[in-house]
């Protein structure tokens, strides 16, 4: 009915009754007969990528400029002590990488973080702590129950749009706008 969801966005609808996922956009990294894994791409933590690297004691090969927008994201409620790095394709192979699409990879090993600031680093990336998982067919049921909208993913929204604008932008890609703004108070 839905086909392979890997490499797509799911967007939480107002029907979503779990506050954890309210107004989230999730990038689906793996979808197969064993279930689904994705990461929330619009919920930044208070931790920057630079702070994470410092806490992990990585020695940067050369200085790299980090902006305030490069925050670690809350990828989901599962395995919150593990890093999930979604990044553009590189010529370098990292230890635990999984091809999501022809140009996007998910890596869960620290060697990708260690590459930051070197020639082997991915050009674009998001760093998430934790992920979101579904049992086989569970996500398809949630989509059928109108908890999620399904959308094609794009690199602009995934890597470049500000975190807090990603939900609106993902909805606008589906032609949904205007009604998304939060209601004001008198």
Curated annotation (Swiss-Prot):
Matches recorded under SUPFAM superfamilies: VC0467-like
Lineage: Bacteria, Pseudomonadati, Pseudomonadota, Gammaproteobacteria, Pasteurellales
UniProt xrefs under Gene3D superfamilies: VC0467-like
Gene Ontology cellular component annotations, sorted alphabetically: cytosol
PANTHER family referenced in this protein's UniProt entry, alphabetically: UNCHARACTERIZED PROTEIN YQGE, UPF0301 PROTEIN YQGE
Family of the protein in this entry: Belongs to the UPF0301 (AlgH) family.
Top-level division of the source organism's lineage: Bacteria
Protein's recorded name: UPF0301 protein HD_1794
